[in-house]
A protein has these predicted regions:
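Flexible "arm" and connector segments at domain edges
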Residues: 1-57, 61-99
């Protein structure tokens, strides 16, 4: 499936879709944060916001998978290694917080 999508759309269009989905993930995450904090009310329920976030994450992941299987624009192994470094750095920062 990924190959057919890539063949029909091409690299630029898939990258544009990835950017659009990233924006939608950000919006859904912000909506969920508002619900969790109970500040700045929204008409969405927790379950609705969760479903929206899951859907947007799935859309984003589909774009990444299409690129991963069809394009050499990035290397997933490098991304995995970078993710490990970034996760460790994030935890280190949290553990070294003052207060």
């Amino acid at each position: 499936m990924e190959e057919k999508i890539f063949a029909k759309l091409g690299r630029a269009a898939v990258l544009e879709q990835l950017a659009e989905e990233a924006s939608e993930v950000a919006q859904a995450a912000l909506k969920m944060a508002r619900i969790i904090r109970g500040e700045n009310p929204t008409p969405k329920t927790h379950m609705e916001a969760r479903a929206d976030l899951e859907e947007e994450l799935a859309d984003f992941r589909v774009c990444v998978e299409v690129l991963d299987r069809n394009d050499l624009i990035f290397e997933m192994e490098i991304i995995k290694k970078l993710s490990e470094v970034k996760m460790k750095r994030w935890l280190d920062r949290l553990e070294n917080m003052r207060g």
